[in-house]
């Protein structure tokens, strides 16, 4: 075989093998490592007490909900506290159990655990309004300045993701699981992509799913070998115990990041990385346990340390 034909044959073989192997292409990644670039809060300061939700804006400012002092805080890109708002109470912009936080280009969306609604603040932490919600909120993601998606809590109906406008009107919904599955078995974390599709991670089931905007399941995967959470009886309810997954997030490269729960190899530290078709590409381990993952647009990952006293920011390094 002469030189040019040999080179052509090798090129065709490489293309063929590449097409046949999952994970190769623009979403290919064999290893992910983290480099710490910022730490906010420590055992010997009062920057944070017990943070629950985090978000970041395009300018690098970081916003954090702190459950222990009932507040929403804004930090500059270097980690210095810029402003703080909120106090214990049930009035506008006040919290009893601050829990979830997300950001749109111009606004912040926060929840109080036992309030059926969403508090809206501008980026200067000025309270703007409360968006009513037909149910308590288990998870929240901003879809724009005037649109949010929530996982609605219900003991009777099916598990639902509701898309609300800025006045609380339901624009669409996805019923992703029948209530016959059991109490709390519909608990999820979710993240939307730019085309309106939703990626779901079930807290008490070994199940990761992708749904279309019109409510069709596109795929479903397990990552823990089909492990099942143990259940326990409390009064008349049978409740799940240990978590399978804790959170799910998207980067800007076509990767889905899933934080494992208590049933993962490294509990609350193992992160599974999938492509958008649900194929597992790699895993990595967080330095400390975390209750959530947050990825900003600059390809940074935020996670917890010191049982919620510390917020860590890491640069994601792809190999």
Language-model segments: residues:
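Bacterial N-terminal signal peptides
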Residues: 9-18
